[in-house]
Amino acid sequence: MTDSQPVNLDTTCTDTADKNLDKSNVKITNKMLDKNAETLEYLSVDDYDYELPDSLIARYPLAQRSASKLLYLATSQQKDSDSQIIDKQFSELADLLNAGDLIVFNDTKVMKARLFGQKDTGGKIEVLIERLVNISDLDSTVLQLETTDGKSINQEHIALCHVKASKAPKLGQRLEIADGHMQAVVIGRQENLFILAFEAPILPDLERYGELPIPPYFERHADATDNTRYQTVFHDPAKLASVAAPTASLHFDKLVLDKLAAKGINTAFVTLHVGAGTFAPVKTDNLLNHTMHSEYAHLPQVTADLINQTHANGKQVIAIGTTVTRVLETAYQKTAVNGKALSSWAGDTDIFIYPGFRFGVIDKLLTNFHLPKSTLLMLVSAFAGKAAIEQAYQHAIDNHYRFFSYGDAMLLDKKTKVQAQTLNKQ
């Protein structure tokens, strides 16, 4: 990050291929494109770049969750460039919503998924647990189920992991983790992930020896404060599977929740277990060439019913964060077809939302400020309008808002009024 310059999320493409792109030949893979949108604009990842002073990166939480600022972007229903920006405090959120509206939270819990250790050769390693899996779910042809010295391997405790090391560990190699309190063997690879077989149940050992995987831009190790503040106040302890927090929810405390309830604003929950891919940069020049990471998600029927009833009553559904957005819009594509009502759904989602996407469920989005060139910045640009997001980010920088996971929040209106409707498959 460099010293502040005017935010411009609409920079000219510098890549020759992008400049000369024949847009008539581009295949749009998004299943939900707004027929009124210029769907082939803003395809260059450089369109989502901006400059941010390092001093505005929030590396520690405020003393009180709801003490953060809230930028309300009241988007015009006609042009996304005619938007009103209102500075509020997060504790005033209820004032911006109406009785009968529905807020949807993500109830996942963050694992202490970061571990440190060494290979049996002595080389240091850092392990980040991405997902716990059953060995039966893996491709057996890529697995080596014995150590380099021919010993059998415990196949009950398997995880997909990121491993940092000066030299990548080999198949069958033993890893000593947490000063020897945890042992694992490399039994395979799945794309950029290592498949590790642990000697003992993984989750209890993570709680004892693991470190909370706070974002890399914090530039520090997790401390005792993070163990509380990098979790939401309403997480489900049984849903311990994320490697990053649903950060928009970190602002909520009892004060805010009580105000929402007192006003008659309803709440519901979905689950999305956040993977490390949420921090992964987009490495392609053209966003249509980006491969989106996949995460497990679940929309329960009780929440689907509340959403359907809320819309039937003419009220709004407010997604708390991009993770909730991805769950609800995926479930809409999967279940709300041919005029059917939204219904329960569970599975992996790799939905990629960028300008031109036609939202089927959410009416407002509460979110934090996102990293340059990130898929999350593309998502909010799709929702509120790219020009409006550009204005809001410049306003936030000029007024010293705090950015990223421990930063301030923004409440976004949808760019156009689109009611939940039948999926039009491309």
Please provide the spans of the model-predicted regions:
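Asparagine/serine/threonine-enriched low-complexity, disordered tracts
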Residues: D18-K19, K23-K27, K31-K35
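Surface-exposed, charge/polar-rich loops and edge strands
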Residues: T2-D10, D34-Q426
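N-terminal targeting/docking segments
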Residues: T16-D18, T29, Q421, K425-Q426
